[in-house]
């Protein structure tokens, strides 16, 4: 566990410097800022890129790289990526090294570029378990690289670029198409209370309609295996506590942040919509399969990048510090418990270095 703690601490420190722009009143050059940004990426890249048998699906990806002909359920875009890497080397370590560089370099860079407190965003990436999950479902996180950039483009008002990036993500992992929902909701004018009501209605309708939806998924999609194998076991073990945390977060920000910011400020809107979508996904997962909550990862970037924007809109500094501390403690405790109980197979950590 110490390797994760030290790696996170170093990354957060360098991210703080990279986004500070100046130290002791002295403005830092762009070159120096980029250097600190690079240093912030290195701990995650080294930890994940040199790992051996760390991550629940590590062995599966290793076999995929060695024998791609054995695997038929991965998308053509992802398999093309694998074939390109195999043309360079048949050693699966290359796969884990390159995917780690792509995933963590993109996240840190986007955090520095988008977040009002990049250090918080990077820390949140770890304590929300996303870093550990990224060493498991690598193909989905490779798709999320495009989703993170799509989020950035959406905030800048470049909707078509955001949609294009979403489609590129879907070429790697088709489930990435769910991000289109955030794009649509982001462009529609509405009140947060009305959106919350709509989400609640969708959840109720979805739970009632799962008995009709599941047979369709099993018969017509490649995700049917999640309803008839060990994936369908222990449905509520992960989603329930995470659902409660997000519900508390949503209720808290509604009471402590002026609704005009949540409805008009682009970063706050993206955050609020993402939280509501994650609540909806986790509620719907109760009637589907435990792995349905994996859709929430596509909106985790928006939450990590723009949570600081919401916190900064709290006019009462005491409330802001209390909420920030509570969020950090809740997620840290939750993720630590999961990792210590061998969730994501992150422990014991092993590296070839």
Question: What is the predicted role of each segment?
Answer:
Residues 29, 35, 54, 59-63, ...:
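Alpha-helical transmembrane segments and terminal signal-anchor/GPI-anchor hydrophobic tails
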Residues 147-160:
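Membrane-interface transmembrane helices that cradle and orient dolichyl/undecaprenyl
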Residues 108-127:
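Transmembrane-helix signature of polytopic, membrane-embedded enzymes
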Residues 18-100, 335-353:
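TM-lumen/periplasm interface segments of multi-pass membrane proteins
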């Amino acid at each position: 566990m110490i390797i994760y703690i030290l790696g996170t601490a170093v990354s957060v420190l360098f991210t703080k410097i990279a986004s500070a722009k100046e130290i002791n009143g002295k403005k830092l050059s762009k070159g120096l800022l980029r250097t600190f940004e690079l240093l912030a990426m290195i701990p995650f890249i080294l930890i994940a890129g040199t790992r051996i048998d760390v991550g629940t699906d590590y062995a599966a990806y290793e076999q995929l790289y060695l024998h791609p002909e054995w695997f038929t359920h991965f998308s053509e875009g992802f398999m093309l990526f694998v074939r390109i890497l195999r043309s360079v080397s048949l050693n699966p370590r290359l796969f884990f090294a390159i995917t780690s560089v792509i995933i963590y370099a993109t996240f840190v860079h986007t955090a520095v570029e988008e977040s009002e407190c990049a250090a918080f965003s990077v820390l949140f990436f770890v304590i929300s378990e996303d870093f550990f999950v990224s060493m498991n479902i690598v193909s989905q996180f490779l798709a999320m690289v495009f989703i993170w950039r799509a989020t950035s483009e959406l905030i800048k008002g470049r909707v078509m670029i955001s949609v294009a990036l979403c489609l590129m993500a879907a070429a790697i992992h088709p489930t990435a198409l769910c991000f289109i929902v955030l794009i649509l909701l982001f462009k529609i004018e509405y009140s947060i209370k009305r959106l919350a009501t709509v989400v609640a209605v969708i959840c109720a309708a979805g739970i009632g309609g799962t008995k009709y939806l599941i047979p369709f998924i099993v018969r017509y999609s490649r995700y049917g295996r999640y309803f008839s194998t060990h994936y369908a076991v222990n449905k509520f073990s992960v989603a329930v506590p995470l659902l409660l945390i997000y519900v508390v977060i949503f209720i808290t920000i509604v009471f402590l942040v002026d609704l005009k910011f949540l409805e008009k400020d682009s970063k706050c809107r993206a955050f609020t919509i993402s939280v509501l979508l994650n609540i909806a996904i986790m509620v719907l997962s109760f009637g589907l399969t435990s792995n349905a909550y994996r859709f929430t990862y596509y909106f985790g970037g928006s939450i990590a990048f723009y949570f600081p924007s919401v916190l900064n809109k709290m006019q009462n500094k005491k409330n802001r510090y209390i909420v920030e501390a509570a969020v950090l403690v809740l997620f840290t405790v939750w993720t630590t418990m999961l990792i210590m109980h061998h969730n994501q197979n992150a422990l014991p950590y092993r590296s070839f270095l």
